């Protein structure tokens, strides 16, 4: 009886893996674009692009971040009405119940990477979802070199020192509350914001090291 249960569990696990594999080859229709990195599918799923972050659009009448509407427009041009394939990492949803995915067009292009390459998004690495970190970072470095999109403005001041956390891939102002909590083994010092972005670290949302004081 115990042997049969083990066999049953093995078959169940294999079937779940097979169904996930099939899901990764299915295409879904995008019916709406919220902003540069979030879309709505026809099946009702709200999808947040994994591994990247685009400038925030303010929906309360205040000023949106630099290039926010350009990022949304480009995302709309690529994805709105398109059939897309979702590829998942280790986590499938975030705390807001949004589906986390790398989104591929029918021609094989990854929307996440296209946004980064155009300089309309930066790499944001959140463990354990690091499957395409290297690819996205390669796209980011090319965009930085060419000073396109957000990089034409974001890296204007390259000289400010900042502290990075190897565990979270975030960088902070030296006086940030979170910077002071970084353990020595995870602490990395950057000579500039430029260096932090070049290594694939993203800015702390509390101390906002990319914003001039």
What are these regions (language model features)?
Residues 2-213:
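Small beta-barrel nucleic-acid-binding modules, primarily SNase/OB-fold domains
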């Amino acid at each position: 009886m115990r042997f049969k249960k083990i066999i049953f569990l093995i078959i169940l696990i294999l079937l779940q893996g097979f169904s996930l594999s099939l899901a990764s080859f299915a295409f879904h229709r995008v019916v709406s674009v919220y902003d540069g990195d979030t879309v709505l599918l026809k099946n009702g799923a709200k999808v947040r692009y994994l591994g990247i972050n685009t400038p925030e659009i303010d929906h309360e009448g205040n000023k949106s971040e630099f290039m926010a509407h350009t990022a949304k427009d480009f995302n709309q041009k690529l994805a709105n009405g398109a059939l897309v394939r979702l590829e998942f990492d280790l986590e499938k949803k975030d705390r807001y119940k949004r589906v986390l995915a790398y989104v591929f067009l029918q021609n094989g292009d990854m929307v996440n990477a296209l946004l980064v390459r155009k300089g309309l998004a930066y790499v944001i690495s959140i463990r354990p979802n690091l499957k395409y970190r290297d690819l996205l970072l390669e796209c980011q470095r090319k965009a930085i070199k060419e000073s396109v999109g957000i990089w034409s403005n974001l890296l204007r001041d390259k000289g400010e020192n900042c502290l990075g956390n190897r565990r979270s891939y975030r960088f902070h102002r030296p006086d940030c509350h979170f910077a002071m909590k970084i353990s020595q083994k995870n602490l990395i010092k950057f000579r500039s914001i430029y260096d932090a972005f070049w290594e694939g670290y993203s800015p702390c949302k509390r101390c906002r090291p990319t914003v001039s004081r």
